[in-house]
């Protein structure tokens, strides 16, 4: 079990939250996908879940992480420097204790020539897809309870991708992974952690659903439509109410200005006071009405106001002979 309680991850250089108030319990055997746009903190969350004690200087965390898992493996998006100079022989027959029966069985499934395990070829000389395949073979033959994968579907051919999908589906291990590949997500995930940056990418929104990816996407789309429609209805009703209220107020104001009867004036003043109180109540109600849902901006481009150049300023001088 991996339990997160009110976890917040803050990027101190950008002065923004990447993850806000995330509470979640991940049970043995769950397949958890972390999704979101580039720069939203997916890899940072993966790092924090692996080890909250050895983080980059620019990350700070609040909240609590507890786990009953004793060992984990991590396959990053890019090949680690420490592996680039290792030979295949050193990697597969070095210090790590591997289940060699499983290793050779998986190699056969992946059509990876098992004779290459004793090769002096360096891992850094392999293609991106082969390097990932080699890391998968190695880590799946170690006795890890928890597996972290950062963009595992990148660089893989279709046959290996199909194999990886089936492996994740059938593996008894708990697997947390990052992916943008929608079909891969649909075939593998049973829990979604969605990291979003809303309000011009100034506010973090962290969503957790114990659903497959397709069900989650359909639910999000339906909720977005329903909230948009409800917000539009609320705004129309508020506008209609306020227009009626303003007409009544204008009538009372006109009567107040024109009346010469003190008794009538007092009554009109009381009515005006009541109308002003009513107006404040309408405004408070408006604040609690359904708001339009935020659609995340993918690219963070915001320009400050531009100062026009002087008409006399020379920008380009082209001299043609």
Q: Residue ranges of each PLM-predicted region?
A:
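H-loop/switch region of ABC-family ATPase nucleotide-binding domains
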Residues: 179-180
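Conserved ABC ATPase signature
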Residues: 122-126
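ABC ATPase nucleotide-binding domain signature region
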Residues: 31-37, 43-105, 196-201
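Conserved beta-strand
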Residues: 4-7, 14-30, 63, 314-321
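Catalytic Walker B motif of ABC-type/P-loop ATPase nucleotide-binding domains
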Residues: 147-151
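Coupling and communication elements adjacent to P-loop NTPase active sites across diverse families
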Residues: 1-11, 98-102, 112-121, 219-321
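Hydrophobic anchor residue at the start of the ABC signature
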Residues: 136
